Amino acid sequence: MKFVIIGGVAGGMSAATRLRRLQEDAEIVVFEKGPNVSFANCGLPYYLSGEIDEREKLLIQTPESLAARFRLDVRVDHEVTAIFPETKEVEVSHGGESRKETYDALLLSPGAKPFIPEITGLSEAKNVFTVRNVPDVDAIMEKLEEQPRKAVVIGAGFIGIEVAENLKKRGLDVTIVERTPQVVPTLDEEMASFIQKELENNDVQVLTNCAVTSFEEQGNMLRLENGEMLESDLTILSVGVQPDSRLAEMAGLTLGLRGGIVVDEHYQTSDPAIFAVGDAIVVKHQITKKPALISLASPANRQGRQAADNMAGRPRLNQGSLGTAIVRAFGQTAASTGITERQAKKAGLSFQVLHASGKDHAGYYPSATDLLLKLIFHPETGEIYGAQGIGQKGVDKRIDILATAIKGHLTVFDLPELELTYAPPFGSAKDPVNMLGYIAMNVIEGLSEMIQWHELPEELAHGKQLLDVRNKEELQKGYFPKASHIPLSELRQRLDELDKEQEYIVSCHSGLRSYLAERILKQAGFTVKNLDGAFSLYQAVRPDELCYPQG
C-alpha cells in the first residue's frame, strides 16, 4: 500500500506517523512545498519578541528525524502542482524539474493561506508581511534588524493580537487597525472589550471600525478610510485565512464554504481514494450542525489521526468541531468554545445568556485574580451552546471544562455536579464553573430573570427603574445615572421606599448581591429583574454612559 500526503505540519504529519504505527510495511511519502515539514506555527509570534528565544525550537521534526523514527519518506521543497485522480498520480515540482508519483490513497493537508486583501499600493509596499510559516518570521526578524520604530497590525484576530503584543515587547510603537467594531471578532462584544482595554493599557493603539484603503510611499504610509494617515516601518497583515484548495479544485474535487474542501464523516473527498484534513476542509460545527471553517491546530491534529485510521481500514467518524480557542494579550487571557451570542442569533436558536464573576482560586488565598465567564445555553433544556472567559489566570481551565461538558453532552444542570479539584491555591469549593450551573438553573427554573447589558438603555427608556444595591463607598468608582441606591444590607428595612407599581432592575458590582436583592424584592411582591454582569460588565463595555464623582 502506498500513501501519499500533500502537506506536513499538524494534519499531514499526524496522519503520516499514525499510518506508520498502523502499517509498518506501507510506503508513506510526504510532499511539503516549504523547507520545514513540522514546525510550531502557533509559536511564531512569540519568536518575534524573544519569548521563544531560539529559532530551532520552532522546528519540531526534520525529514531526517522522521525517517529515523518512523521510516517516512519526507520530501521538503517539493510542490505538488497537479493531481490526476483517474490515474492516481500527482505531479511534483522540485529544483525546476517535474515528475509524477503514484498513490493508492492520497491525503490532502494543504492548510490555509493568509487572506491578502486588494488594497491600493500593497504590491509596491516593501515592508508588509504575513505570519504563517518559519520563512515568514525569518523575513520579519530580518526587518527588525533595521530597528523599525512604528508597526501597524492590520486585523485584530488571534494572530493579530499575538503579533501586536510581541512587537510591543520588542520595543516598537504598535497600532492595530480592525475593520469590525471590536477586537477578537470570535468573542462577543462585551468580552472582547476587556482585551481591547488591556491592549490600550499597554500602550497599543487600537483603531476599530477602521480599514486601510491604500499603501503609500512603498508602504511607509497607510491611508485609512477616514482620510487619516498612519506611519509604518513594519506592517503585518493578519486579516484571516482562506482554504488553500487550489489543487483540489484543479482535480475536480467538490468544494464548499468559501472554497473549502468538502469531506464526509470519514474525511473522504468526492473522490473515494482522496482524503483531506486540516484548515482546508469544511467541517460540521457541533452546535449549529452547519458547515464551518475552523483553522486551529488541535482539530487538525485530531483529523490527521482519524483520517489515517480510515485510510488504513479502521473506521473513525468526524464528530464535528467546537472551535475551542484561547489568546493572551499581555496580562489578560481570553478563551472560547462553541458559539457566541452573535452566532446563536444568526443561527436562529432559542438561547439564554448569563455572566458569572469569580476568582481563579479561593479569594482569601494570596494572589487571587478576577475571572469572568459567559455561558450561552438553551432556556429550557439547559443544553450548552458556548462559553467564553476573560481573566489573568485560570481561564484555560474553565473553558476546557466547559468544552469537555459540551462534547460530553452535559447540560447546565450537570455543571453543579462536577467534582473539580479544590485547595485554596488552585480553586474554590464552588468553582466558577459550578456557579455557572447554579445561576443557569435559577434562570431556567424561574427564580431569577435577567436582562443583558445591551438591553438596559431600552428597558430604562420604557419606564423601568434601576436600583443599585452596592455600598456607598463603591459609588465613588462610578454609578449609573438616575439610578436609585439602597445598599443590600439595608434593603429589607427600606422596602417601604419602593413602589410596587414600579418595575425594577437591580444591579450591584458583579451580579451576586443584585440576585440576592432580586429574591428579597420578588418575595416581597415587587416586579424585578437582575442586570446580568451588573455594573462591572457595563462599565467595561460602555464606560462613557456612566457617571464618575469629581476628583
Give the location of each predicted region:
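A Rossmann-like FAD-binding core segment of flavoenzymes
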Residues: 25-27, 69, 75-94, 101, ...
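Mid-to-C-terminal Rossmann-like scaffold of FAD/NAD(P)H-dependent oxidoreductases
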Residues: 1, 8, 12, 280-393, ...
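Beta1-alpha1 glycine-rich phosphate/pyrophosphate-binding loop at the start
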Residues: 1-73, 158, 164-187, 324, ...
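FAD-site-proximal beta/loop scaffold in flavoenzymes
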Residues: 124-147, 219-223, 228-306, 401, ...
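Rossmann-like dinucleotide-binding cores of NAD(P)H-dependent redox enzymes
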Residues: 59, 150-151, 158-214, 296-300, ...
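Glycine-rich dinucleotide-binding loop and its adjacent helix/turn
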Residues: 110-170, 205-206, 263-265, 486-488, ...
